[in-house]
Curated annotation (Swiss-Prot):
Keywords: Arginine metabolism, Hydrolase, Manganese, Metal-binding. Substrate binds at H195, P196, D197, L198, Y199, E203, G204, N205, N234, E321. It comes from the Eukaryota. The lineage of its organism: Eukaryota, Viridiplantae, Streptophyta, Embryophyta, Tracheophyta. This is Arginase. PANTHER family: ARGINASE 2, CHLOROPLASTIC_MITOCHONDRIAL, ARGINASE/AGMATINASE. Belongs to the arginase family. The keyword Metal-binding applies. InterPro entries: Ureohydrolase, Ureohydrolase_dom_sf. Pathway: Nitrogen metabolism; urea cycle; L-ornithine and urea from L-arginine: step 1/1. Mn(2+) 1 binds at D193, D197, D278. Its cofactor is Mn(2+).
Length: 350
C-alpha cells in the first residue's frame, strides 16, 4: 500500500513538473504573438531577480550592522526538478531542508561551534521562483541564466557567499558558472556523488542532471574536478572524465584513497573551492530520500571528515538531489541534507 501511495505521489509530481510545458502549449494555442509573450516573460524574470536582489541587500545590511564578517554563507533555494531523468521530487526539497535546519530536535550550533543564529555566519535569501517562470513558458536556457544571475546578485553583496539548496543536480552548472565568471577564473570543485554527471547529453537533454559537470568542464569553469563516492559509472562516464581530466575516486577503492581525501588542500592557483554534495553520495542506509538508490556508498561521517579536514577558501556550494517524496513521514533524509547545509555553512563562513 505504501508503494501505491508513493507511486501516486510521484505521478502528481510529474504533473506539476510538466506544468510549464503544458502552459507553453496553451499559450501557443491561444495564438499570442511571440513578441508579446517574450515581453511578459521578461517582466517575470525581472520580478524574480528583483526578489533575490532585495532579499540579498537586506541580509547584507544586517550582516554589516553586526560587523566583523569576512564570509557569510547565504542560503538560496533553487527548487528545480524537471531536469531529472527519473523523479522530479527534488523540486520540493528546499522548504524541507530549511525545516530540518531549524527544527527543535537539534540546537543551532554546528560541530565546530559556530551558532547559525548569528547572521554573520549564515543568512537566507529565499527561493528563486522557478516554477512560476516555467508556468510562463520560460525554457531551460533562460532559467539557467536566471540562476546564474541570482548567484551573482548574492556575490555582489560582500561578505555574502552562495550556498544553494537544490533541486536536482542540473543546478550545479549555472551556479559554478556564475561563481567562476564573477571571480574572473575557474575554481576547484569537490563533488560528492554516486554518479559522475558527465554525459554530453542525457536522453536528448543538454541541461540534464546527468550532464551538469560536462557543462562545467567544457565551459572552463573548473580548474580541477574531484569526484568522490562514484559507484555508478559506465564507459561514457570514464571517457568523459579522461577527456576533461577529472579526478574520480570510486567507492571500490575508497579504503585506499581515504588518507588522501581526508587531507585535501584545494584552491591554490584557482579562484577558490566549490563544494557540491549530492545526497545520493551516501549509502541508502543513511539517506533513503533520494531519487536514485546506489548501495555501497559513503557514510555521513566519511563526508564530514573530508569536508572538515579540507584546506582551502570555499567560495560557494550546493546540496542537491534530496527528494522529499521518497522517504517516510519522519523526514530523516531532510535532517541529513540539513546537517550537510549546517556544516558546510560553518566551513564557508569566517
Amino acid at each position: 500500500m505504501s508503494f501505491l501511495r508513493s507511486f501516486a505521489r510521484n505521478k502528481d509530481i510529474s504533473k506539476v513538473g510538466r506544468r510549464g510545458i503544458h502552459c507553453m502549449q496553451k499559450l501557443c494555442a491561444e495564438k499570442i504573438s511571440p513578441d508579446s509573450l517574450e515581453k511578459a516573460q521578461n517582466r517575470v524574470i525581472d520580478a524574480a531577480l528583483t526578489l533575490v536582489r532585495e532579499n540579498t541587500g537586506l541580509r547584507k545590511n544586517l550582516c554589516h550592522s553586526l560587523g566583523g564578517a569576512v564570509a557569510t554563507s547565504t542560503l538560496l533555494g533553487v527548487p528545480l526538478g524537471h531536469n531529472s531523468s527519473f523523479l522530479e521530487g527534488p523540486a520540493f526539497a528546499p522548504p524541507f531542508i530549511r525545516e530540518g535546519i531549524w527544527c527543535g530536535s537539534a540546537n543551532s550550533t554546528t560541530e565546530e561551534g559556530k551558532d547559525l543564529k548569528d547572521l554573520r555566519i549564515m543568512v537566507d535569501v529565499g527561493d528563486i521562483p522557478i516554477q512560476e517562470m516555467r508556468d510562463c513558458g520560460i525554457g531551460d536556457e533562460r532559467l539557467m541564466k536566471v540562476v546564474s544571475d541570482s548567484v551573482k546578485l548574492v556575490m555582489e553583496e560582500d561578505p555574502l557567499r552562495p550556498l544553494i539548496l537544490g533541486g536536482d543536480p542540473s543546478i550545479s552548472y549555472p551556479v559554478v558558472r556564475a561563481i567562476s565568471e564573477k571571480l574572473g577564473g575557474p575554481v576547484d570543485v569537490l563533488h560528492f556523488d554516486a554518479h559522475p554527471d558527465l554525459y554530453d547529453e542525457f536522453e536528448g537533454n543538454y541541461y540534464s542532471h546527468a550532464s551538469s559537470f560536462a557543462r562545467i568542464m567544457e565551459g572552463g569553469y573548473a580548474r580541477r574536478l574531484l569526484q568522490v563516492g562514484i559507484r555508478s559509472i559506465n564507459k561514457e562516464g570514464r571517457e568523459q572524465a579522461k577527456k576533461f581530466g577529472v579526478e574520480q575516486f570510486e567507492m571500490r577503492h575508497f579504503s585506499k584513497d581515504r588518507p588522501f581525501l581526508e587531507n585535501l588542500n584545494l584552491g591554490e592557483g584557482a579562484k577558490g573551492v566549490y563544494i557540491s554534495i549530492d545526497v545520493d553520495c551516501l549509502d541508502p542506509g543513511y539517506a533513503v530520500g533520494v531519487s536514485h538508490y546506489e548501495s555501497g556508498g559513503l557514510s555521513f561521517r566519511d563526508v564530514m571528515n573530508m569536508l572538515q579536514n579540507l584546506k582551502g577558501d570555499i567560495v560557494g556550494g550546493d546540496v542537491v538531489e534530496y527528494n522529499p517524496q521518497r522517504e517516510p513521514p519522519d523526514r530523516m533524509t531532510a535532517m541529513v541534507a540539513a546537517k550537510f547545509v549546517r556544516e558546510l555553512a560553518a566551513k564557508m563562513s569566517k
